Amino acid sequence: MRSRSNSGVRLDYYQRIVHRLILAHQEPVTGLFPASNVNSHAWIRDNVYCILAVWGLSMAYKKIADQDEDRAKCYELEQSCVKLMRGLLMAMMNQKDKVEKFKMTQSPYDSLHAKYSSKNGLPVVDDNEWGHLQIDAVSLYLLILAQMTASGLQIVFSLDEVSFIQNLVFYIESAYSIPDYGIWERGDKTNHGEPELNASSIGMAKAALEAMNELDLFGARGGPASVIHVLADEAHKCQAVLQSMLPRESNSKELDSGLLCVIGFPAFAVDDAQLIHNTKDAILSRLQGKYGCKRFLRDGYRTPKEDPSRLYYERWELRMFENIECEWPLFYCYLILFHAFQSDKRAVEEYASRLEKIMVRSEDGILLVPESYAVPQDLVGFEYQKPGSQVREVVGRCPFLWGQSLFILGRLLQEGFLAVGELDPLNRRLGAQKKPDVVVQVVIIAEDNEIRDKLAEHDLHVQTIAEVAPIEVQPARVLSHLYTYLGRNRKLGLSGRKSRDVGILSTSKLYSLKDRIFAFTPQFADLSRFYIASDNELMIDILKGEINFLKSAWDLLGRPLVTLVLKRIHLDQDKIPLAMIQTMRKLKSGYINGTRVMLGSLKDFLNTSAITDLSFLGSTEDGYPDRLHPDVQTYLDEHLLRSFSNRSTMNLRGGQLRPRTLRRRMSCKGAIKKTRSINVDSDNLGMEGPSPLTERRLSSIVPPPWLQANKQSHVSVFATTPEEGPTSSPLSLGNDLIRENIYPVDPHHSRSAIDRRSEFVRQQEMPKILIQRHRAETNFADTEVEELIAMLRETENLEEQGDILQYLVDTQGLDFNTAGLGFKNKSEENATPNANNAGMLEEGRVVTVRDLLKGLYEKACQQKLWGLVRHTAGMLGKRVEDLAKAVTDLLVRQKQVTVGMPPNNEHTITAPLPEVELRQLIHDAYGDDESTAMLTQELMVYLAMFIRTEPQLFHEMLRLRVGLIIQVMAKELSRTLNCDGEAASEHLLNLSPFEMKNLLYHILSGKEFAVSSVARGNLSIVSCKSSRVSKKSQIGLGDPEGEDALIATIDDRQGQWLRRRRLDGALNRVPRDFYSRVWTVLEKCQGLAIEGRVLQQSLTQEMTPGELKFALEVETALNQIPQPEYRQLVVEALMVLTLVTEHNMVPSLGGVIYVEHLVHKANQLFLEDQRKVQGDATLCCAKIKDGKEQQQAASGMLLCGGAAYICQHLYDSAPSGSYGTMTYMSRAVALVLDCVPKHGEMECAIS
């Protein structure tokens, strides 16, 4: 017998250890590992980790397999791995119905089980008896399956199993938005069964998606049918959310040692080296101990203070577990592997030494990794006094197979039997290394020869759609539909991918299908999806952002390819817009916004672009893999004909109808404006919302409070005849001039008569009028509706058409058929259709009011009448592109969203919702105000864009109150344009999508801005720096004279601090580390009272300082304050209190502190100082009041208009300085709190 080499002898030693400690427990039938000798439950996660040592040892044997004996051992170890992975696969395939159902519901009760019987692979607990939804476990299985397959093992045997694996990919691809129970199976750390978004689950899912992409599950023997496909955008969504969360684990766990498996082996899910370093350092500094690392702060599992008789904890008892949490040697194993992959030998040796000191030696001398170490019951008091001082004892399983397996892997790496590349054949560890710059390829295609020739005049040479053949160009929705066929399997009852939107990463590739090649245009350029695609300026802005995104996110083979089609609808007065020409020239130059680009034709980029094979569209199940699925063939044939054809627009002017002389002319002017609910006239934003929703539903037109100031005792719904003189509509502020400017109407068409309903209204002797818009209540006769239809045919003015259609919708309904006109109120013998009583026609077909609205919507899009576009889009139920995705993008980055106007109708969105529910929630919040409902959806999309590209804008903001943001935007326009609230609201709703996005950016960033032109729909937002205009919107700049006039007004800085506080309050922005500092204040007092809500000291027992749940509690209390500027003064008062606690001025702050009392005391001190120095406030709040002024003050109205009885001049004071708000807050704290010294000089250095 040949002698063994030293390495062979050493491997035999590890083989014996692996067999004795791990393989001896493997069930012979299923291949699964039971939890222990007395517990037959097999967890997916634990089982996968257990087999890693076996896999690693098999690869070590393969390298030295020079004898049959070694080759046999290698094969036995490999087949043990295959046995386990197939055992888990069979257990999950038995629950294939759950995989299918979960794609639709994403409910925890429809998820795959987290554990199975090790004896037969069947479920062991019911759906509702365990926290089964653990996305990290399924993701870990897929990740290791990919790595093992890449290493040469064949685990998947049939195409049915391939289909199931493909559907497991769909199961985890939305991990970034699905709360689960996480790596420790408990969700919220109180263990009450509340799932939450976990960074460890998202990271593992991201790693699995990237590992499975384009992987052939049959290895070298596979073909196109055995390849797994993943849409790159889904993995990137996980990456973006993961990066925004780290180093936080979840809402209730501010840090978790489980993240070590995400930033290192096996996931390598983070591409940012600095973020990896920061996360590791945070774990080591706060969770590392002598015996390993704590799982997370205040983890009560197996501590002596835990009550083992119940699964959950009371919230107040979490504080008991602080500093006595169990420490887990498992995490030293992770740290050894982490540093081994970093090639840091010194750190590997350090943690290996620490680990060996705490391992348990068995009777035969084998080192065992215990599950955890706990403080003994009798030493808990000493550990509280001096954390880390007491000797701990082993609790739980020993050996802990999960940890033992990773320990053996670490030893194999340390002794050189394995290279790190063998444990990571897919090279995931290289993700954080610097990558070469990406060159983005751009192709512009003309819709027809005429557009091509127009571009050629500008020295821009492109091809037409016909000329790029045989390459076919299709919109993104076609690609989305094709992917619904991926993973379908009739035998298993699997329906494939749920139809979802596809992102820019997916459309930036070419796709091959048999002998055809497809290029897809980006989703944002799809005009059929939503109106913002009709705004050329916004499309250019989005294009630049997407090109910049590709630069940072692209990691596929080949270069990204962006394909755009220039259509007739993009033309402006039959000319190509200058903005488009300028952008194309920038693209041609080779750089745009710092990104390297190449402009060319599709055939030029065939060899350099990424190409994906759509072979899954074959009829594989029917035995014809080379033949397209019949449904796919039909779909593609249809789409080739109609994908880029122009849609006809409804002709509102019935060509067959002869206009007849009307007995009287009616005007529905202002019908759309009556639905508006934006209120900006009150100086105190957030105080006066619209009328309560219930009232507004019963009565669609309710005069707002300011109407009571109107001197007229009678209010008309419609404009009167010229003889009777003008009368304000209910929503008018008496500014008819502005309304006429906004709605220019031909005087010939403005003559109108009072209809019967208006006559009825005029008889009522009431200043407030409730007017019903339900069809059952209408007093209109059909003849009058006929006259409205005739007016609709005659008028060329789209605004007037909109008012008429709004009135028809209110009185007749969207589906009112105009064919019925003229019959009901005529005698039967005269009930014959003729040219005078027929309805609106298009090509001989009678149309409904809905059809007329569609035509109006399309015309408004073409003419860029954005206020009308938004309103008609809302009436037609149009959806903003990616609304649910946009809200999800905000929520998963820990930003809650509220919709509706404060304070009455705000609805908070705290979890991702389906699109239908979201739209219903928004429309419930705004009632009949379709314009603002659509604007809310639009702003949500822009907010999501900003949080993806400029997340720093949202730092220290937990809740985005969209309704309040809309009010502030209108208020800012009112301030800048020096106009009243109604005019500002109209200007806001008439902003183009590009300028709306630009204005929102200025609000978020706090930058000063001005408006360079005031033409409707042509407002241009101009950034201002100091008193000079430094930056403008890239498109649509105003005239120089207007800008000069604006610059002159910017010099006056009065009101800047009030504006800043108002903006910060509306955006719920707070100082850095604000919430954790408030926690320290709450720890030293009995409570903090804010606007009637008390934050109890017990919150510090339930939550840690950095816990997101605590921040949300404070935020909820602050949101009780309706005025944003007053809210910011309360925040400043809280910051002064934090300074008191941080400098340890007093051991305790006493009882409940009424924070608002501090603010009002500061205001009183401010007014006293103002009287002494004869400051500005002596003109209002600081002057001696006469009787009338005292009465006004008693009724809550200050002369200066300050909110919440606080002088406007205090709001407009800088925080610092001797007359700064923080100085007065400090003095107020010293006076109000009993614990602060009252005597002696107070030196305050407030920053």
UniProtKB/Swiss-Prot annotation:
Residues 853-883, 1052-1089 are annotated as: Calmodulin-binding. GO terms for cellular component: plasma membrane. It is found in: Cell membrane. GO terms for biological process: glycogen metabolic process; positive regulation of glycogen catabolic process. GO terms for molecular function: calmodulin binding. Pathway: Glycan biosynthesis; glycogen metabolism. The modification Phosphoserine is found at residues 1030, 1033. It comes from the Eukaryota. Coiled coil: none annotated. Gene3D superfamilies: 1.50.10.10. Although the final Cys may be farnesylated, the terminal tripeptide is probably not removed, and the C-terminus is not methylated. PANTHER family: PHOSPHORYLASE B KINASE REGULATORY SUBUNIT, PHOSPHORYLASE B KINASE REGULATORY SUBUNIT ALPHA-RELATED. Phosphorylase b kinase catalyzes the phosphorylation of serine in certain substrates, including troponin I. The alpha chain may bind calmodulin. This is Probable phosphorylase b kinase regulatory subunit alpha. It comes from Drosophila melanogaster (Fruit fly). The lineage of its organism: Eukaryota, Metazoa, Ecdysozoa, Arthropoda, Hexapoda.
